[in-house]
Swiss-Prot record:
Entry GO terms, CC: plasma membrane
UniProt subcellular location: Cell inner membrane
Gene Ontology MF term list: sodium:proton antiporter activity
Annotated keywords: Antiport, Cell inner membrane, Cell membrane, Ion transport, Membrane, Sodium, Sodium transport, Transmembrane, Transmembrane helix, Transport
UniProt name for this protein: Na(+)/H(+) antiporter NhaB
Entry similarity comment: Belongs to the NhaB Na(+)/H(+) (TC 2.A.34) antiporter family.
Record organism: Shigella sonnei (strain Ss046)
Length: 513
């Protein structure tokens, strides 16, 4: 029997999403204009909360759809303008180029990455040392590469690992739907579940590693560049200025990695099942045996392109996205990928997230137009100089957990610079505030996927449903890191930042401009 027109429309709306989720979004769309007529400020914060809700429910429905509907309505009712959204997109063009090209570029280096990380995984049998190595590697790479790039690398490796075992467990040699477990025996499902736990922990260690390394250098995160430019610091200056906070945080973060693995807290401690290790070992042995001279040349070419990638990013020879485009061109040309559809597969992972980030910029435009953060900024600047450092750090951390890091860092450094230029604070205090702003923006934001773009990218990637990594589970697994990084960072800002910076100046390592 044919269903009614209304029922058909309801089923099509947001597809397979639960009915309660569809109803909640409709209520949001009805309530927002009414609240906006009464209080634009309250409506602005309500929109932010609703957008966070769509991110939290990412596994129910990709946030681009509900978030996009909320953003379109916000522009339509006047919470912001289409022109302001365009300005925000233009201001963040580098980030969009990064997502479009750098993430796609990594796709053409997956053979090399899978080769390297397979050897790493098979050669290190201790889960603690393996977790530490993933965390350290991610931290080191994130000091030179964008965190999204590093996470994209680890995601591609994890999907490769998962795909290898899933094909064996399902007794299928060709590419299959990795989310389809219907052909897997009960015994294999138990092992697969343990393997998922193992991959979840590695992904979280690597994700936190990107935050540990990304905060240390001016090229580690997009907002770092903005803060460095506002303070007039170069690469070495930035590293030394941040080190009184970032070095102790890095050490404590790595110790936390070992601790949660040792004690099996917060969902960590799952080891690589021996059956999976055997499958990966067989795959590695078979791959090496079947590797032709042409395959070896591909690996060598990818390694050379990897050297070019790190060198170009470290020396900042061009914008990150353009370097990513050069990786695509070099890799496809030298490896021999010439078919348009084969090249197009590289963009499958990144473009939905690029669209989602563009929607997020419209929410940022609402935050600016409705001055949602103004009361907080005014409160902080009225405090004493000593209290300002901790307050800037704390409020940056709180806002960065629910908003865009680049936006929060930009707003605070601009306000601090304006206060310095007006004479409200000294140049020396401004430089200390720049450190507090940068560390406060980067460290506590690991608390939620909303705060770290790399975490959000992981949550909305094809890998997340495969390893059962939901929003809530990600927040839970990030909790020990959140507590350690936030508290150690706060203590360093409070007690070590000023005296160590003063000592650096006396040694002549840094100077006030």
């Amino acid at each position: 029997m044919e269903i009614s027109w209304g029922r058909a429309l309801w089923r099509n709306f947001l597809g397979q999403s639960p009915d309660w989720y569809k109803l909640a979004l409709i209520i949001f769309l009805i309530v927002n204009p009414l609240i906006f007529l009464i209080s634009p400020f309250v409506a602005g914060w309500l929109l932010v909360a609703e957008f966070i809700f769509t991110l939290a429910m990412a596994l129910k429905c990709y946030p681009l759809l509900p978030g996009g509907l909320l953003a379109i309505e916000a522009v339509f009712i006047g919470m912001t303008s289409a022109e302001h959204v365009r300005e925000e997109v233009a201001a963040n063009l580098e980030v969009l180029l990064l997502l479009m090209f750098m993430v796609a570029g990594i796709y053409f280096m997956k053979q090399l990455l899978l080769f390297i990380f397979t050897r790493l995984l098979l050669s290190i049998r201790s889960k603690m040392l393996l977790s530490l190595s993933f965390c350290v590697a991610a931290a080191f790479l994130s000091a030179f590469l964008d965190a999204l790039t590093v996470v994209a690398v680890v995601i591609s490796v994890a999907v490769g690992f998962y795909g290898i075992y899933h094909r064996v467990a399902s007794s299928r040699t060709e590419d299959t739907d990795l989310q389809d477990d219907s052909h897997i025996d009960k015994h294999y499902k138990v092992v697969l579940e343990q393997f998922r736990g193992f991959l979840r922990s590695l992904m979280m260690h690597a994700g936190v590693g990107t935050a540990l390394g990304g905060v240390m250098t001016m090229v580690g995160e997009p907002q770092n560049l903005i803060i460095a430019k506002a303070a007039g610091w170069h690469f070495g200056d930035f590293f030394l200025r941040m080190s009184p906070v970032t070095v102790p945080v890095l050490i404590c973060g790595l110790l936390t990695c070992l601790l949660v693995e040792k004690l099996r807290w917060f969902g960590y401690g799952e080891t690589l099942p021996e059956k999976v290790r055997e499958v990966l070992q067989q795959f590695d042995d078979q791959s090496r045996h079947q590797r032709t001279r042409q395959d070896k040349i591909r690996l060598i070419v990818q390694a050379i392109i990897g050297v070019w990638l790190v060198t170009a990013l470290a020396l900042h020879l061009a914008e990150v996205g353009l370097i990513g485009l050069s990786v695509i061109i070099l890799a496809t040309s030298l490896i021999g990928v010439t078919d348009e559809h084969a090249i197009g597969k590289a963009f499958t992972e990144s473009l939905p997230f690029t669209a989602l980030l563009t929607v997020f910029f419209s929410v940022v435009a609402v935050i600016i137009d409705q001055q949602l953060f103004s009361p907080i900024i005014q409160f902080v600047l009225q405090a004493s100089e000593h209290a300002q450092l901790s307050l800037f750090y704390i409020f940056n951390g709180l806002l960065s957990s629910i908003s865009d890091n680049v936006f929060v860092g930009t707003i605070y450094i601009n306000e601090a610079k304006a206060a310095m230029e007006s004479g409200a604070i000294t140049l020396k205090q401004y430089e200390l505030l720049a450190v507090a702003i940068n560390t406060g923006t980067n460290l506590p934001s690991v608390a939620t996927p909303n705060g770290q773009a790399a975490f959000l990218f992981l949550l909305t990637s094809a890998l997340a449903p495969l390893i059962r990594l939901s929003y809530g589970r990600m927040v839970w697994m990030a909790l020990p890191y959140t507590l350690v990084l936030t508290l150690v960072g706060l203590l360093c800002v409070e007690f070590t930042l000023a005296p160590v910076t003063e000592w650096f100046m006396q040694m002549g390592w840094i100077a006030t401009l």
